[in-house]
Amino acid sequence: MSGLDIAGRYHFIGIGGAGMSVVAELLASRGARVSGSDRADSPVLERLRGLGITVFAGHDPAHVPADAVVVVSTAIRESNPELAAARGRGQRVVHRSEALALAATGMRFVGVAGAHGKTTTSGMLAVALRSAGADPSVAVGGVVPQFGSGAHLGAGDVFVAEADESDGSFLNYSPSVEVVTNVEPDHLDRYGSREAFEAVFAEFASRLVPGGALVACAEDPGASRLASHARERGITTITYGRPGRCAQRPDAAIEDVDSTASGSTARVEWDGQAAVLRLAVAGEHNVLNATAALLAGAALGLGLPEMAAGLASFTGTARRFEERGRVGSRRLFDDYAHHPTEVAAALRQARVVAGAGGVTVVFQPHLYSRTRIFAARFAEALAAADHVVVTDVYAAREDPEPGVDSTLITSALPGSLHVPDMHEAARIGAGLVDEGGILITMGAGSITSCGADVLEFWRRGEAQ
């Protein structure tokens, strides 16, 4: 972050991405001159234009101001014409995490990390803090209804953000509070092994400012090991979980968990205090996420009861088991799940919500490397659905791998269908949903665009 000026000029390549757009919005809110580009126009670009940010559809060296610091994510390749031109001119290029750290200058930074659960936990924490009067600044990878965006510049001194472990960029932060929802191995194309993945989280914990606190889920073996090592190094640590599912009794015990289609309840006991969670979101995993947010608020100095009251108003974030529409008694949901554990959690939530109705999934695998590594586990997780349609792999930043495609999943899951074309996948998936059933479009890529097709097929009665 050295040498970056909050009032400077910044050009974001790939500004339409969830992580990039929120940072661009926050920097602009703090007085920076911001521009950006993305491959194609989108509602995100239109929203940024409405905020006064100059954005372009398509990449062209002419879009890059000569005096701008160029901001990129790991997804941007060196061959990108704007990036190549900026490097050729000797312009400074920084990662989005460095720009985010700049946007948080002067605030108490709360970094929420973990292979899954980051967006929901960050959103929960932000909503609860706002309800408690803290008015935090926020950088979340999904739209939070209370803020109308994934970005918010608050009047308070707290900054809540997702801390991305996928490329190690969370090491650019110096948090006052860290939340680690889990350390379940992912991104093994980068890290290579569980040990290396856990090591980068240990390094993340060492980035806490003096007097900072680590909040970690004791139900997850990796996060539990992280907490133990942090304690050994003298770091203030708060663990949480359901005692019967933890190797050691957690500091904050979650009891009396109940989840129904309309929400979840639980009791949390910590440090002689108790709070009752009454959540408007279903799923036991959301009880864990809410407890993490509750304790992060406590680490910032807020009381458990006021944090619990704020959590009751959280209704979800975009693409996290988000209801997108209904036709008759059939309902459509959309979920960002792209790791087997996330898929399993989403389908447990789906079963609660669907009740006696059926559950159909249209799943888009994300990354060839993840598909290769987790194909069998994806098949196992998806087996919880009644019907499964799998589209082609969404490549994102990767090139295709020989022998790696979606049939690695469907061949391990009898009765599932591989349908490469997303429109066709939507038609087939829609036709598998009976009255009272639900369909979930699932994945971290472009799969959400199938939703409109599903609803249209239902409306027209064209699903076969």
Please report, for each region that a protein language model flagged, where it lies by residue.
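N-terminal leader/targeting and accessory segments in enzymes
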Residues: 1-99, 213, 221, 282
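C-terminal helical cap/extension that packs against the catalytic core
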Residues: 378-435
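Short internal beta-strands
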Residues: 32-39, 213-218, 360-364, 384-395
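Phosphate-binding loop of NTP-binding sites
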Residues: 26-29, 49, 63, 74-218, ...
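Short glycine-dipeptide loop
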Residues: 208-214, 355-357, 435-436
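Conserved hydrophobic helix-helix packing surfaces used for dimerization/oligomerization
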Residues: 10-12, 70, 110, 158, ...
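Nucleotide phosphate-binding/pyrophosphate-handling subdomain across enzymes
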Residues: 2-11, 19, 23-30, 171, ...
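Beta-strand->loop->alpha-helix junctions that form or flank phosphate-binding loops
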Residues: 37-38, 56-59, 94-101, 138-142, ...
